[in-house]
Amino acid sequence: MDKINGLPDDLLVKILSYVPTDIAVSTSILSKRWEFLWMWLPNLDYTSRWCRKPGDVGLRDFIHKNLPLHRAPVIESLRFHSNSPDIKPEDIRRWIEIAVSRHVHDLDIDHFSENENIFLSSFFACKSLVTLKLRSVTLRDIPSMVCLPSLKTLLLDNVSFVEGKSLQELLSICPVLEDLSVYCDDYENTKELTIVVPSLLSLSLYIPDEWLLDGYWIDTPSLEYLKLEDWNSCDHLSLIKNMPKLREAYVDAKCFLPKSVIESITSVKHLTICSKDGYGDGFVFNQLEHLTLCVCRGDSPSLLGQLLKDSPNLRILEISVMEDHVDDVGISLDGWNQPSSVPECLLSSLQIFKWPQYLGRPEDRDIAVYILKNARHLKKTTILADRCERFVTQRRMIKELLQALPARIC
């Protein structure tokens, strides 16, 4: 302890910054010198783990008492996660106001506010804010004549827009936004989504099954990465355009694979995709080098055949099951018919073939054997039996594949 006490205060504060905030606060009982050291921490993390009384009353009282007196001139990050009814919207509103006055860089709020606003209009003019993460909150009173000039990362999870406000109104005051993640659960107030952000580089959009959605419109000319999880089973419009710089896409379309989605991703170099639908003729993925295809659904092989045919420069092929699709895996696959002619990528470019969750269904074997027989420039193949070995053991898988292959490959 004597050695630690010999360190300067700024170094002790740096050490405290590596432990959870509540642990840092607990060091205040060590000595008079340590009593207020934690109050110089630039990063504050308040969650329900602070509870020492029923509900979050202990946390509420602690923040009310100490946040206004916090000594750090800049609060680099403030994280608050709690759904306790003891903490009111006006409490959070006050804490956010203090953080803004201390030039907060990163703000992470998770609190169900029951359609009550937790943001003052002045918040939307915060010049220092770089990252904003909101969960289960309500947004209203979004002024149009101000902006968040430094905001680059925005995450919205189950955020409600009321009184006619919309996602696009928020996006329109974020002139340098680069990373946007939207997880939609606001069924009542949002029937359509519009995302028009000229500066955006990365977009993740999740659309749930139960939502009665009219459609979504996306215009992001600088986008380089797209993650689209469209699980909606209702017929809806989609318009995705103006993505000339897109290089990587993750598309999980549970029911429909809109034409505009395919049109927007033909320039990618890396594609991860799961869909029960094909996409029709007339599309070519000339730049696609790395394809990961999820085969959880029965008709996945037909999509594989299309993509092999339309990706003449494919170098890496990975067949797998997406992590959250394990429960959707069917007993059999349908729709695998060997192409009438061997795809160009198998003849000239495919070098790596991976199948990390090989299930051993008859169709799985047919696909694997077809690729191994016809890939003329294959350098590396990795096929691993499904960890649970639901359909085939590792030993049986190896035996079946070796028996099916010609001697020159074995």
From Swiss-Prot:
Give the signal peptide as a residue range, or say none if absent: none
Q: Which GO terms describe its cellular component?
A: peroxisome
Every copy of the F-box domain together lies at 1-47
The record's annotation in InterPro entries points to: F-box-like_dom_sf, F-box_AtFBL13-like, F-box_dom, FBD, FBL13/AtMIF1-like, LRR_dom_sf, LRR_FXL15/At3g58940/PEG3-like
Which Pfam families does the record match to this protein?
F-box (PF00646), FBD (PF08387), LRR_At5g56370 (PF24758)
Ranges of residues in domain FBD: 335-385
| Gene3D superfamilies listed in its UniProt record | Ribonuclease Inhibitor
The source's domain of life comes to Eukaryota
This protein is called what?
Answer: FBD-associated F-box protein At5g38590
Its taxonomic placement starts with:
Eukaryota, Viridiplantae, Streptophyta, Embryophyta, Tracheophyta
